[in-house]
Amino acid sequence: MSELKYKRVLLKLSGEALAGENKFGIDPATVSKICHEIADVVDMGLQVALVIGGGNIFRGLSSSAKGMDRSSADYMGMLATVLNALAVQDALEKLGHPTRVLSAITMQEVCEPYIRRRAERHLEKGRVVICAAGTGNPYFTTDTAAALRGMELKCEAIIKATKVDGVYDKDPMKHDDAVLFPRLTYVETLQRKLGVMDSTAITLAMENEVPIIVCNMFKGSIKRVVCGEEVGTIVQGG
């Protein structure tokens, strides 16, 4: 068994990732594939907290631009993340991994309320913790929620798993000559506006000196990252 570099990480997934080849909704086959990647690292003893976006169901920011009240749109987006969290919970538990969904918006018939100490106890017991409903406040993205939960739960790294292999100078899905950045500082990421995470999330990680690693959600990349291999892009340092 490979030795783990980290004991506890925060894994951020976009909602769009769950849609697979579709542009909308939840694709069960894709969710299962992602959960196999997560299960591989949990089997190694890694403690995993998850934050999942809701963009495959509802994106508050784009809808507010069409005239909807921003707060209402953001709350709808938060509820979308709960749907995604329940889908991932179901898939992980089918693989034999106890999983708890903790929501920043109370809905006691569906999931537990997010309480930091409770989340930490679940992690210590080897359960996967899915933090749903963002921060529970409008105007904050799920990127910011991921950074916040990562700090609260004392995670040693934030891993952002995406459809591409890391951070590029331009969109690699559209440009064959896109160049991958193996390493970036927090300040470089902010100045270049590379879209790794939003500025609030990056600043929070920078202030608390928690590295952000951007990698492919498949190809065994998450496992390679937690074992200490230099995969994708690592954002750290001044």
Curated annotation (Swiss-Prot):
Chain's role: Catalyzes the reversible phosphorylation of UMP to UDP.
Family as reported in the entry's similarity comment: Belongs to the UMP kinase family.
Name of the gene: pyrH
Superkingdom: Bacteria
Protein name: Uridylate kinase
UniProtKB keywords: ATP-binding, Cytoplasm, Kinase, Nucleotide-binding, Pyrimidine biosynthesis, Transferase
Pfam families linked to this entry: AA_kinase
Record's keyword annotation contains Lipid metabolism: no
Signal peptide interval: none
The protein's assembly and partners: Homohexamer.
Subcellular localization: Cytoplasm
Regulation: Inhibited by UTP.
